[in-house]
């Protein structure tokens, strides 16, 4: 059987600050703001760790540009993947849910 892509783990019970911090987690380098400032909020920390992995993936994709031949393709596909997963993360914050993103959740579990 196919595993579902979005897995709802829990709902958030926080305030507006928690939602803004969780949303900032998926906006590139801004993932460090909630990661450093909201370690005590489990909801924000969950999203911050996923945002950190997405940011690291985008940095690695930039290094792929230096590969001759396949670098531009690899960068393009990686950038599209990061963009789509960031949008899914922002949607999960807008719906006040925590969804484990595919491909990312395995790396987040190691952090």
Curated annotation (Swiss-Prot):
Residues 1-17, 72 are cytoplasmic. Induction: Part of the probable 4 gene mamGFDC operon. Disruption phenotype: Normal magnetic response, no change in magnetosome size or number. A double mamF-mmsF deletion has a normal magnetic response, slightly smaller, fewer magnetosomes. Deletion of any 2 genes encoded in this operon (mamC, mamD, mamF and mamG) decreases crystal size regardless of the protein combination. Deletion of the mamGFDC operon leads to smaller magnetite crystals in irregularly spaced chains, but no other phenotype. The keyword Transmembrane helix applies. Keywords: Biomineralization, Magnetosome, Membrane, Transmembrane, Transmembrane helix. The lineage of its organism: Bacteria, Pseudomonadati, Pseudomonadota, Alphaproteobacteria, Rhodospirillales. This bacteria makes up to 60 cubo-octahedral magnetosomes of about 45 nm in diameter which contain membrane-bound crystals of magnetite (Fe(3)O(4)). It is found in: Magnetosome membrane. This is Magnetosome protein MamF. Subject to cleavage or degradation; identified by N-terminal sequencing of proteins that are about 103, 92 and 15 kDa in size. One of its GO terms (cellular component) is magnetosome membrane. It comes from Magnetospirillum gryphiswaldense (strain DSM 6361 / JCM 21280 / NBRC 15271 / MSR-1). It is a multi-pass membrane protein. The keyword Amino-acid biosynthesis does not apply. May form homooligomers. Plays a role in regulating magnetite crystal size; partially redundant function with MmsF. Belongs to the magnetosome MamF/MmsF protein family. Disulfide bonds: none annotated. Residues 39-50, 94-111 are lumenal. The gene is mamF. The chain crosses the membrane at residues 18-38, 51-71, 73-93.
